[in-house]
């Protein structure tokens, strides 16, 4: 008969605990953060930028001991390919299988708009680091689980108009927009901004994301007397606008939403890509704050291909995702748990965060789910395949 001493029983218990803390168990104890974004196709570069911004923030948080008593954060990504249906499948997998505490996503407004009803129903906080459609955060849900650290169409549209009128003395606006919910959102916003000034567009033209010849639409805008084009579209079709203008020989100012920044714009558009001025929320060029210098150093250390600001592109993807992840971590800490309702309330309890883009002071409230405002935007253009603030040629 085997007799167990007290010491033996303690040893057995310790071994049992050790066995329980297998890699799988430890992984389950991490706090999973989901990301649904384009990781392939023309906008893959932007999806990678979001990944890098979030990863740097997560590394910082984990190095400080993690959250909620030492739990580390783990990033789990899924590729939506810019397709709303695939985005929904990816979001459901991350919510129901991976059990993410917070879901980030993504690049395209149609994808985000398809995901928002799911996160509101399942009470999973959703942070948008790119998609600018006004309805992503202003979705009418109560309670609303969608937050954003990015541009907002309604504000961008006013900024585009003000910039065009100040910079190019624009008085006859021609709208050239992608034919999807993002384009519709901006058509309403630009038209409303013009109406506030007693104006209206001289023409509104639409294009499909797959179009390669926009000469017919642009010719109609030229015939209508447009003296400035207001462009809303992602990388590929925005490049086709530039190439179509080249074929027409029409030299007209182009003021754009930030779609051109999302990928291989200069490669696809050619040398006149520099003629497009587009909105951004951040640039790594020029004098950086201490946070900016720290992030650049961390990016260089983690990604050897990054040698300087030229290689951090698109900058807005990195910056928005970095600040968004830090704010989400603060919300989890304020919540004291990974329960969705508590994290949502945690966002409202954030008092201050000195971030990469700016210092955020009470960035969220039940009526304000967008952390960035119009005065946080900057205007940029491509110079020698680099995204630089307009007027900066370093």
List each language-model region with its residue ranges:
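Extracytosolic ligand-binding ectodomains
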Residues: 2-12, 27-394
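N-terminal signal peptide c-region/cleavage motif recognized by signal peptidases
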Residues: 20-23
């Amino acid at each position: 008969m085997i007799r167990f001493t007290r010491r033996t029983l303690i040893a057995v218990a310790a071994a049992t605990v050790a066995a329980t803390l297998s890699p799988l168990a430890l992984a389950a104890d991490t706090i999973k953060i989901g990301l649904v974004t384009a990781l392939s196709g023309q906008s893959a570069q932007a999806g990678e930028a979001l990944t890098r911004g979030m990863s740097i923030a997560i590394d910082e948080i984990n190095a400080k001991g993690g959250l909620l008593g030492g739990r580390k954060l783990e990033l789990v990504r899924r590729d939506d390919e810019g397709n709303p249906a695939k985005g929904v499948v990816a979001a459901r997998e991350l919510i129901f299988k991976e059990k993410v505490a917070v879901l980030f996503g993504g690049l395209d407004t149609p994808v985000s708009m398809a995901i928002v009803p799911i996160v509101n129903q399942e009470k999973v906080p959703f942070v948008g680091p790119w998609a600018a459609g006004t309805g992503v955060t202003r979705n009418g849900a109560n309670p609303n689980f969608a937050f954003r650290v990015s541009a907002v169409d309604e504000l961008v549209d006013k900024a585009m108009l003000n910039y065009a009128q100040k910079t190019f003395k624009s008085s006859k606006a021609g709208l050239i927009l992608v034919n999807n919910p993002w384009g519709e959102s901006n058509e309403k916003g630009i038209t409303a901004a013009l109406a506030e000034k007693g104006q209206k567009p001289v023409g509104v033209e639409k294009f499909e994301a797959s179009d390669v010849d926009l000469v017919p639409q642009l010719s109609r805008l030229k015939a209508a007397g447009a003296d400035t084009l207001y462009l809303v579209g992602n990388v590929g079709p925005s490049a086709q606008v530039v190439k179509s203008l080249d074929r027409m020989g029409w030299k007209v100012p182009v003021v754009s939403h930030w779609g051109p920044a999302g990928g291989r714009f200069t490669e696809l558009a050619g040398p006149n890509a520099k003629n497009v001025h587009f909105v951004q929320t951040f640039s790594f060029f020029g004098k950086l704050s201490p946070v900016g210098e720290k992030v650049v150093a961390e990016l260089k250390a983690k990604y050897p291909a990054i040698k300087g600001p030229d290689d951090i592109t698109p900058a807005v993807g990195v910056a928005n995702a970095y600040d968004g992840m830090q704010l989400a971590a603060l919300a989890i800490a304020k919540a004291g748990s990974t329960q969705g309702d508590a994290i949502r309330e945690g966002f409202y309890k954030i008092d201050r965060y000195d971030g990469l883009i700016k210092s955020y002071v009470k960035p969220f409230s039940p009526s304000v789910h967008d952390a960035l405002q119009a005065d946080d935007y900057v205007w940029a253009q491509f110079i020698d395949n680099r995204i630089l603030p307009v007027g900066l040629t370093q």
